[in-house]
């Protein structure tokens, strides 16, 4: 208690404001930029051919109204991929390539895509805003 008294009111106010800002509900979200080497149109085709819409709702993909996985709308504005990976292009490519290795409890199957296809998928998902 003596320590708090020595800090004084201005220091306590600054500390409280800093903690309040750090504990906010959402981190600032920004739309991710283009994925190096990724083509959004090819990504849409890969998503269609891989039947991602069986599990996910995906704007712009015919019949993609799945309810098993999360909807992939506004993907670039999300802070995390699969609830725990920071949402970066490289992390998304890794997730698309190896979901079971990253999270053994995930329901997402291995799609057996190559890195170029995963980059294309990431490019498509990041332009969904």
Can you say where each PLM-predicted feature lies in the sequence?
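Extracytoplasmic electron-transfer domains, predominantly the class I c-type cytochrome c fold
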Residues: 37, 45, 63-129
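Short acidic/polar alpha-helix capping motifs at helix-coil junctions
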Residues: 57-58, 70
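C-terminal motif of bacterial Sec signal peptides marking the signal peptidase cleavage site
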Residues: 19-22
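Cys/His-rich metal-chelating microdomains
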Residues: 26, 58-59
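Short cysteine clusters
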Residues: 52-55
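Electrostatic cytochrome c docking/interface patches
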Residues: 24-48
């Amino acid at each position: 208690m003596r320590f708090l008294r020595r800090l004084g009111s201005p220091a306590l106010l600054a500390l409280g404001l800093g903690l309040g800002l750090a504990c906010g509900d959402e981190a600032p979200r920004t739309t991710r930029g283009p994925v190096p080497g990724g083509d959004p149109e090819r990504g849409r085709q890969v998503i269609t051919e891989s039947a991602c819409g069986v599990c996910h709702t995906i704007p712009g993909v015919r019949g993609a109204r799945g309810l098993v996985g999360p909807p992939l709308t506004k993907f670039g504005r999300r802070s995390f991929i699969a609830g725990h990976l920071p949402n970066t292009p490289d992390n998304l490519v890794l997730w698309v390539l190896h979901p079971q290795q990253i999270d053994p409890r995930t329901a997402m199957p291995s799609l057996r895509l190559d890195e170029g296809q995963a980059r294309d998928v990431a490019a498509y998902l990041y332009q969904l805003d």
